Amino acid sequence: MPIETEPNRTRKNFEPKRFGGSLFILFTLLLFLNLFVLRGPRFPITAYSDFITQVEAGQVERVEVRPDRIRYILKSDQYGFNEGTETAAVFDTVPVGIDLELPKFLREHDVQYFAPPPSSLSWLPTLLGWVVPPLIFFGIWSWLINRNQGAGPAALTVGQSKARIYSEGSTGVTFDDVAGVEEAKTELLEIVDFLAHADKYTRLGAKIPKGVLLVGPPGTGKTLLAKAIAGEAKVPFFSISGSEFIELFVGIGAARVRDLFEQAKQQAPCIVFIDELDALGKARGGPGGFTGGNDEREQTLNQLLSEMDGFDPNVGVILLAATNRPEVLDPALLRPGRFDRQIVVDRPDKMGREAILKVHVRGVKLAEDINLTKLAVRTPGFSGADLANLVNEAALLAARQSRDAVVMSDFNEAIERVVAGLEKKSRVLNDLEKKTVAYHEVGHAIVGSLMPGAGTVEKISVIPRGIGALGYTLQLPEEDRFLITASELRGRIATLLGGRSAEELIFGVVSTGASDDIQKATDLAERYVTLYGMSDELGPIAYEKAQQQFLEGVPNPRRTVGPQVVEAIDQAVKDVVDGAHHMALSILSINQDMLQLTASHLLEKEVLESQELHSLLSQPQFPPDMDEWLQTGKLPQGKELIQTTLNSHQLIGIN
């Protein structure tokens, strides 16, 4: 995206390199003048004792006494010169201290002596001694602070805003380039309409929001929406990241905030966009924030609060910000009068994903078999950035195969690349490892096909992918889901344990290949108990504090509880996992023929999908106690867990 201009301010035409070169030339001339012009001719220097000896011997004809030295001329006959010749022996000597007896000594030996008249340039060496050192210091300092600067001294620009300014419509993005977030677009269109027709609102006494905060997971299009607003509104657009306010020097952040708003007022109507606001606006003294009254971030935040609450709401300056961590922002920043409106930009649903795909495939040559609706169904949970990457990956795969257009198989492979990682055909498994992986993946597929809300098993593969996956099972939901019931959570845990259960049932031992499944199953069971309150023993009590609303993978802190409660939580989690493990073993036991047949086909072809896979998994049998377990989470009274009756496990490793 082209940058129209840097911070909009008038600067002097200051060229540090030219200035430094001129200073160097001036210094060289002064040094040459002092060393060669002002000092005059040079003569041999003798010892002061030799000078005294020569005077006593009557060899000295004339002496010139200077403040710092004595210059004397020997008699011509001492060197064999004839009288009247212009050649004479001239020497310099430096006296030892101040010799007050020297005039008397010279008179006694009939030696002429005199002091030279003051020179008209005698002041120049003194002046150079005072002027040249400061000039040298200033020149070095000027060069150091300007060597990395394109214009102006850094000391004079460090407090200026680093915001990039885009002229009217120069972002190159409009609302036609944004899809899948229709509700957010509708809200932001009001901002655009205000900038274009402000009188429509002010004549009724309405006030446009001073600030609009875009919140949502990463990659959902928050920054893209901000660019679209600037492109649609045809007004100057200031863009800066929250981290660009803070620098090494104290007070720079607050100065840059002041400078940013001064520029914005001069360019009004305009939009000021601060990306990653959480880098600047963390709660003061709160969780994830900063402490200390002199903290640079706190000073910068205070200045931002002052500027947002201080400028006239109808001058046409609208502050737009984006963050994926709204829970850590300072409450004073979110109050009405500052960020009046908060717009959630969430992951798109099926229709939104299809609309986003239509935007991103505009410049891509597509084959006739491409069905964007099917692609939208196969990409649940994908953000706008994920879908853009998906289209690009599919185009790259088609180019790698030298195709004239992108076909549906390219998109299917691209989805698997995004979800499971790259294929690693060079990783060769031995027969035992390959057989173990095959039964492991088929175990996932059979158990998952019977669980409620789990979706359809689309593909099973024993080709290694990604960092550590030796195989994978692709199971896609039939629709977008926003709520999950307790029975569906239990079914997901059982599906995760289906791979390990198949290994136990067929081989009598388990491998390390199930470690990731166990980790995910345990995490889900712990949330089942501590966050969702679905345990009958502990009741609807949340033992974890949900903090990260839009960022995944960040653990929630547990509340302070007593040791008895901790023990009860651990037991409840174990009961959930044990019940799911028992149900997975029960399902695979009564469907062992299906497990054997499907695994043999998978070992032969390495990949099973489409109709062939559906026919193999078409009629699985249900354990008699599965419905009761899914509904209540309890097994029949006195029912013994299947895993307790199996042989003791022997740990083997699969690399």
Swiss-Prot record:
Compartment annotation: Cellular thylakoid membrane
Signal peptide range equals none
Membrane topology per the entry is: Multi-pass membrane protein
Its transmembrane ranges are 18-38, 125-145
Q: Which GO terms describe its molecular function?
A: ATP binding; ATP hydrolysis activity; ATP-dependent peptidase activity; metalloendopeptidase activity; zinc ion binding
Q: Required cofactors, per record?
A: Zn(2+)
Q: What is its main location?
A: membrane
Q: What biological processes does GO assign it?
A: protein catabolic process; proteolysis
SMART domains named in the record: AAA
Q: Which residues lie on this side of the membrane: Lumenal?
A: 39-124
Record GO cellular component, one term: plasma membrane-derived thylakoid membrane
Query: What does the record note about the cofactor?
Result: Binds 1 zinc ion per subunit.
Which residues point to the Cytoplasmic side?
1-17, 146-655
Q: Where does Zn(2+) bind?
A: H440, H444, D517
NCBIfam families registered for this protein in UniProt: FtsH_fam (TIGR01241)
Give the record's family classification. Answer: In the central section; belongs to the AAA ATPase family.
- Please name the HAMAP family in this protein's record: FtsH (MF_01458)
Stated role: Acts as a processive, ATP-dependent zinc metallopeptidase for both cytoplasmic and membrane proteins. Plays a role in the quality control of integral membrane proteins.
Q: What is this protein called?
A: ATP-dependent zinc metalloprotease FtsH
* Organism whose genome encodes this protein: Acaryochloris marina (strain MBIC 11017)
The gene name reads ftsH
